[in-house]
Amino acid sequence: RLLGERLQKRGFAVEYIRADGAPGDRNSHPRINVVARYEGAPGGECVHFNSHIDVVEAGSGWTTDPFGGEVRDGKVYGRGTCDMKGGLASSVIACEAILEEGLPFAGALEISGTVDEESGGFAGVGYLAERGYFTKPRVHHVIIPEPLGVDRICLGHRGVWWGEVETLGRIAHGSMPFLGDSAINHMSAFIHLLETQLQPRLSRRHTAEPVEPPGARVSTLNINSIPVSNVILDGRP
């Protein structure tokens, strides 16, 4: 609501879109996206700034409260300040500056804060895309201010394919493991197969889309455990 209320005060038309039926959406924790639009003069195109508002788990090793937003020496410390509240704040401030200066423009400015980017995007960008929020003539250009740096500006996306694998075993007492069948061993063997057989084949595949930089055209393999899908784990008990 903070994002929507701030932009509404600036004259944006604000819409809250709950991802009904999407993975993770439930009444106790509804998955709600924010889309705010400011209409300029007619006849122009729409530029949309998209940022995700979810974060990965805090992890260990923090010397500050990961959700405290502490400001120290001109820097903000907290989980998600870089990825990607910083990009979201920059988008908001940039659009507000255009409006404050009274710069005339044709078309529209649009800002969205979406959920679920770190765990698949099904309730966030994916949900909105399926409902036409990013298609012409509604939106013509999308800028995603992820924290990559000015030397790593990307154009396009090579796409993604998600898969979920579950291995089964048979329980046994720890003193007699030979009576059981370890699901962990099965998963370990499967991961080894992916890394030795699939990964080399994927590394030779490149998207035909004009994605920039060229290194982002290469297919990669990311293996993680539920509930985290978009972070490389530093440890798991």
Q: What are these regions, as identified by a protein language model?
A:
Residues G4, A89-E96, G126-A129, I184-E195:
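Predominant activation on well-ordered alpha-helical scaffold segments within soluble catalytic domains
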Residues N27-I32, A41-G44, R158-W161, P214-S219, ...:
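A short, glycine/Asx- and small/polar-enriched loop/turn
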Residues H141-V142, D151-H186:
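Metal-dependent peptidase/peptidase-like ectodomains
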Residues M84-W162, P213:
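Acidic/histidine-rich catalytic neighborhood of metal-dependent amide-processing enzymes
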Residues L155, G174-R236:
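Acidic-enriched catalytic cores of C-N bond-cleaving enzymes acting on peptides and small amides
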Residues A13, V76-D83, S175-A183:
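Short alpha-helix boundary/capping segments
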Residues R1-V76, E100, P104-F105:
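Acidic/His- and Gly-rich active-site-bordering loop/insert found
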